[in-house]
């Protein structure tokens, strides 16, 4: 079925040239607040993920020394879906033409790769863990997205933006890691445990946290993060910067007692 075009709910802007670890941290925290529909023990929860209604997005406008690129991110799941080159007007969408799902961004040109990290890494010809994530990398990403038509450069730059904004918004440890190392002159890599233990589990962790909160009969399965056993949903919640709200978590709880 043809999907509907995404409506943009708000736009946030960030100048990469003057970015510091502190202003980056503040930006991520403000972004979480802008996205929140409610809070669970102080942690923002995203709007209900809805596949029937018109998809909602937000734009992130990034500038560096006069160069501009705007990326469009799906609000319900924080997946980067497209971007706009400098002065081009036309949007480029992360979707292979062969998927036949239609355009999430109206009038967009479909790229040769989809939004998953597997497809992005294949197009970039580089592993997620081999890419650098710091201020230099972000400046380079903005410059490349503003003007480059090279698939490898585009894909690598989109990975940098997705990690440093989408993943950092999802996870406290990832935001802290990027903030602490932002101004490093050496390449800054993503630790493997953050990819394996956190990033690959955000949807599942979100579900477990909200289900535990809504359903007294839900049995929480202990999780392992960085070698530590996490025994409760409240403990797991501490790792999340924002929680995805899946419709399944709102099913009526069992009859307790």
Swiss-Prot record:
What sort of enzyme, by top EC class, is this? hydrolase
Tell me the SUPFAM superfamilies matching this sequence: Ribosome inactivating proteins (RIP)
- What are the UniProt keywords, alphabetically? Disulfide bond, Hydrolase, Plant defense, Protein synthesis inhibitor, Toxin
Which residues are annotated as active site?
A: 167
Keyword field contains Hydrolase? yes
Catalysed reaction(s) here are: Endohydrolysis of the N-glycosidic bond at one specific adenosine on the 28S rRNA
This entry's Gene Ontology molecular function terms read: rRNA N-glycosylase activity; toxin activity
Which BP terms does GO give this entry?
Answer: defense response; negative regulation of translation
Query: The organism sits in which domain of life?
Result: Eukaryota
Q: Hey, where's the site called Important for catalytic activity on this chain?
A: 79, 117, 170
Q: What is its EC number?
A: 3.2.2.22
Q: Which Pfam families match?
A: RIP
**Which cysteines are disulphide-bonded?**
217-254
**So what family is this one in?**
Belongs to the ribosome-inactivating protein family. Type 1 RIP subfamily.
Annotated function: Inhibits translation in rabbit reticulocytes.
The name this protein carries in UniProt is: Ribosome-inactivating protein charybdin
């Amino acid at each position: 079925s043809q999907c509907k075009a995404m409506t943009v709910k708000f736009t946030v802007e960030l100048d990469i040239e003057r970015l510091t670890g502190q202003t980056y941290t503040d930006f991520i925290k403000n972004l979480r607040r802008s996205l929140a529909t409610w809070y669970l023990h102080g942690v923002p929860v995203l709007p209900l993920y809805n596949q029937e209604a018109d998809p909602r997005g937000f734009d992130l406008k990034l500038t560096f020394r006069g160069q501009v690129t705007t990326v469009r991110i799906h609000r319900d799941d924080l997946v980067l879906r497209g971007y706009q080159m400098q002065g081009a007007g036309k949007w480029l969408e992360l979707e292979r033409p062969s998927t036949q799902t239609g355009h999430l961004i109206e009038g967009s040109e479909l790229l040769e790769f989809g939004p998953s990290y597997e497809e992005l890494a294949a197009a970039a010809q580089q592993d997620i863990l081999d890419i650098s994530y710091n201020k230099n990398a972000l400046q380079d990403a903005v410059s490349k997205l503003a003007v480059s038509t090279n698939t490898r450069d585009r894909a690598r730059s989109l990975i940098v933006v997705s990690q440093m904004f989408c993943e950092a918004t999802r996870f406290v440890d990832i935001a802290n890691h990027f903030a602490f190392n932002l101004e490093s002159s050496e390449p800054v890599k993503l630790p493997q445990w953050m990819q394996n233990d956190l990033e690959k589990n955000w949807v599942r962790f979100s579900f477990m946290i909200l289900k535990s909160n809504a359903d007294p009969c839900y049995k929480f399965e202990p999780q392992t993060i960085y070698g530590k056993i996490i025994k409760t949903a409240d403990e797991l919640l501490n790792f999340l910067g924002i929680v995805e709200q899946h419709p399944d978590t709102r099913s009526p709880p069992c009859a307790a007692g």
